Amino acid sequence: MLSVILFTEKLNHSSKNKDMAAKIRCGIITIHNIPNYGATFQALGLFRYLVIQGYEVEFIDYSMNKPMASNTCEHSTLKKLLSLPKKLLNYQYYLNSKTKATAFAKFWNKHYKLSKHHYSGDNEFFDATLNYTVAISGSDQLFNLSLTNQSEGYFLPNVKNYKISYSTSFGMSGLSGDNEEKLIRLLRSYDRLSIREDTVAEYLKSKYGI
């Protein structure tokens, strides 16, 4: 939360009243629409913190790139087919999953404020103009390119104003050799970085001065 606090303190110092604060528009990009308790509550926590400061806040309604075809497709398909009879027989599992997804959707509709436009993948997102005073990536594993199907949208490359990351994670992949050059290029565009993994943060600071 440190990078967010530092930024909001800077804004509060320059804002004379709540009316001025309300004119400050904050856009949050995160994995906001999966039925997962951790992802949902950490997204809502950041959202509520900024709203309490008096800012106009919304989630950028962005979906990561669709999975790319790979050589493991045949193996994955076979694995899914072998597990299909078990899932079909487990009707209670299906009902529980459906009930959970419905409950999450109701919660999101009640507590989230989304951008008016939905962006599906990088190609559509990069063409958009985002008019936020500040844009925030975080938290969750947005910097884990293996998890996000190489989605660069979570790095907000089309944001020209102030941009920070809040407690963003690289996941188990860390800074892998294949993605390191790409990640460094994307990370350098941030005004402030808050990273969850201490070892990665120290590595970025010592090797790249980030």
Give the location of each predicted region.
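Aromatic- and Gly/Pro-rich donor/ligand-binding loops
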Residues: 26-37, 41-185
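Helix-loop-beta element that forms the nucleotide-linked donor phosphate-binding surface
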Residues: 201-210
